[in-house]
Structure formats: C-alpha cells, structure tokens
Design a protein with these regions (language model features):
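Polybasic, low-complexity intrinsically disordered tails and interdomain linkers
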Residues: 1-119, 182, 191-223
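Sequence-level detector for tyrosine residue identity
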Residues: 37, 89-92, 123, 140, ...
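Generic structural motif recognizing short loop/turn segments at the entrances and edges of beta-strands
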Residues: 86-88, 122, 170-173
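Extracellular/luminal Protease-associated
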Residues: 106-159
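Short basic, glycine-rich beta-strand/loop surfaces that mediate nucleic-acid
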Residues: 138, 145-211
Length: 223
C-alpha cells in the first residue's frame, strides 16, 4: 500500500462529531466587576510566629482532653473520671463547629444570645492549608463575621498535631473555643485577641444599597 492509499485521521474532530456533540453550553450570569458578595476569602493576617505560639498553647490546653479520649469506656467507668473542665468550652470537627457557629449566628440575628455566658463562642481556628478544596473554608470569613468570632488560620500540618493531642482517629481541621476557655487560659485570650476581626464591607450598614451588575453569557458544560 502506497502513501496515497493510506487513510489519514482528521487532526481535529469534525463539527458534527460525537465529541463535539457532547459539549453543550448553558447560560450563566457573571459579575461585570468584582462583587462584594463573592469576596469570601478575606482572612485576617496572622504572623507565622503568632500562629506557632497559638498551636503550642492549644496543644498544651487540649492535652488533658486527649488523655481522657484515649481511655476506654471501661477505664472511664472504673476510674470514675469525668471530662476535663475545659471540654465544656471546646468544640472540634468540621460538622460540630459549623453547627455551633450557625446556631450562634442565628441567636445574634434574633438578639437571643446571652452575652454574659461563658459558652459564647469566641475563637475559630482553621487549618486552611490542610483542607483539600477551597469549598471547605471559603465561607468561614462571612460565617465568623455573622457569629462574631475571631477567625484564626493555623499553619500547615496542624490538623495532624490536633489529632494527636486530642487522641482521635482523624485529623482535626476546625476547632472552636468559647469564652470560658479564654477565662481559664488568659494567655490564650491575649494572643488570640491580637488577631484582627474579619472585615467584610458589604456586611456593614451603609446609606446606599449595593448594586451589582451582571451580564448573561455562556459556559461550556462537559459530560
């Protein structure tokens, strides 16, 4: 067979090919300029030194909880040990922290929050760099603003340190401390209060309503 008899494959799929047919477009709205409603990743700056100091202090505070968690149920029953007092003011785990923050946010909005309670959430620690996708952490600035808590980013690999000190089977990427913990450990409060509050412009009350313009465009959808 000579070169002229060979069948050459098209370099690109034809316009009516199955591959092209699989590509569809859908209509979407996109902001003309940056929208304040989409600026979710506004994290307060925390120096490396402060982050490391906070991690060391947190590990020291949580060690008592870890000792209790490592005991079997039989050991807890036979020894008569109760949870450490600090446990009352510590919440860890993504789902548990989210639920607590959302509940506090609702209480603030409805003006039902007991201001002098030691159980008011005060500090939200997030291992942002240890999370696998931004979807897991990009909402925390807005949520922390609504819940009126300090948002503090911790260094990479802190999730494993928290897992170890708490005696758990899975890494801990989110940790919340209540006001009572700050009373028990004044140094913790002093360090954490050094972090600025989340500042999100559109959450502030203003004389004019924010108007965000959008355009209708198309986005390719692949099957």
């Amino acid at each position: 067979m000579n070169n002229q008899d060979r069948v050459q494959k098209p370099s690109k799929p034809a316009a009516n090919s199955l591959k092209q047919a699989e590509k569809k477009k859908r209509e979407v709205f996109k902001a003309v300029l940056a929208s304040p409603y989409s600026r979710r990743n506004l994290w307060p700056a925390v120096s490396v030194e402060l982050q490391n100091n906070l991690v060391d202090l947190l590990c020291s505070i949580l060690e008592e909880i870890g000792t209790f968690n490592r005991l079997s149920q039989a050991e807890k029953n036979s020894s008569g040990l109760e949870k450490p007092s600090i446990s009352e003011y510590v919440i860890y785990g993504f789902n548990s922290c989210m639920k607590a923050l959302e509940e506090q946010s609702k209480k603030i909005q409805s003006m039902k929050l007991v201001l002098n309670s030691d159980h008011i959430l005060r500090y939200l620690f997030v291992c942002k760099l240890d999370m696998t996708t931004p979807l897991l952490f990009q909402h925390f600035p807005i949520l922390s603003a609504y819940a009126n808590v300090k948002l503090i980013q911790l260094p990479k690999n802190t999730h494993q340190k928290l897992q170890k000190v708490l005696g758990l089977k899975k890494p801990i990427e989110v940790l919340v401390l209540a006001k009572g913990a700050a009373k028990m450990y004044p140094l913790l409060a002093e360090l954490a209060e050094g972090v600025e509050d989340v500042d999100i412009e559109f959450l502030r009350s203003g004389p004019f309503e924010a108007k965000i313009k959008h355009i209708l465009t198309q986005q390719t959808v692949k099957k």
